[in-house]
Amino acid sequence: MGAALALLGDLVATVSEAAAATGFSVAEIAAGEAAAAIEVQIASLATVEGITSTEAIAAIGLTPQTYAVITGAPGAIAGIAALVQTVSGVSSVAQVGYKFFSEWDHKISTVGLNQQPGMALELFNPEDYDILFPGVNTFVNNIQYLDPRHWGPTLFSAISQAFWHLVRDDLPRLTSQEIERRTQRFFRDSLAKFLEETTWTIVNAPINLYNSIQNYYSALSPIRPSMVRQVAEREGTQVTFGHSYSQSIDDADSIEEVTQRLDLRNKEANVHSGEFIEKTLAPGGANQRIAPQWMLPLLLGLYGTVTPALEAYEDAPSKKKRRMSRGSSQKAKGPRASSKTSYKRRRRSTRS
């Protein structure tokens, strides 16, 4: 027993020195993770740089003794465990320790699972149970939150937590939505009141271009410029074709008369001033909000309350000719034919 303890002490001291030299923990060296990492480094260096394993060990800063301790620590632990089993009969402790270090990521104990099948662990999927039994998750959550033995404090704690989550998560979201809604409503209301209270003026600028084009083509004379030039040459006068001749050129006696009439028309005052739309007060003196009929679809559109009747009024319903079938046309022609025949019969009767 003393020899086993001495070997174990020497192994612990050696592993501790190797851990201090390499930076790995004792558990990593005992589990073999340090040896695996060092072997990967050595293999990569030997493959990339084309050096031997001894040179690779020296390149990463390890001595052959330290490398031997790191690679032989797991086997030495297993050998000491077997020695302790033969000497003192405490093999279970060594076996469990060696298995713990070799399988470091194992976190669930499997002792007694074969002897007690009812202790086996299974995955819990609450979604499946909620599909089979709707509402079971809510019931389970309430049971977990409320303790039947101390239902008062647990109920107060659950309510306070729910209120805190409401204040922390839901209240800022609701507040931002309400602020956004109020801002939009205020902007639309302000714009609608501005459109109601402002002074509107009729402006014909967009249609002036079309009116001028219409006037130009309507004022063109049916007489060609070549004919006008011939008349001017015959009378010995000069004609400037920059002028647009009026419709009365046909009844003019000479080119001078045409030019005089053109100058007189240009001197006439051409009024393009706008007319203000008169504001009317609310009927009955109730000081209600009023708006012209042509502005009503715009204001209701800002408030989002456009009715189908206003849409039809604004867009103007499409006028489609109703097609008549042959049967309906024949039926329509029937009374006319009968009236004609009766008229003919009456004429015949009068002749006879």
Swiss-Prot record:
TM segments?
290-310
Q: Which InterPro entries match?
A: Polyoma_coat_VP2
Positions of the region Disordered? 312-352
Mark out the compositionally biased spans (Basic residues).
342-352
The record's region (D1) falls at: 273-308
Q: Report keywords, A-Z.
A: Capsid protein, DNA-binding, Host endoplasmic reticulum, Host membrane, Host nucleus, Host-virus interaction, Ion channel, Ion transport, Late protein, Lipoprotein, Membrane, Myristate, Transmembrane, Transmembrane helix, Transport, Viral attachment to host cell, Viral ion channel, Viral penetration into host cytoplasm, Viral penetration into host nucleus, Viral penetration via permeabilization of host membrane, Viral release from host cell, Virion, Virus entry into host cell
Query: Per its UniProt record, what Pfam families does this chain match?
Result: Polyoma_coat2 (PF00761)
Motif Nuclear localization signal location, chain numbering: 316-324
Lipid modification (N-myristoyl glycine) maps to 2
What family is it from? Belongs to the polyomaviruses capsid protein VP2 family.
The name this protein goes by in its record: Minor capsid protein VP2
Native source organism of the sequence: Simian virus 12 (strain wt100)
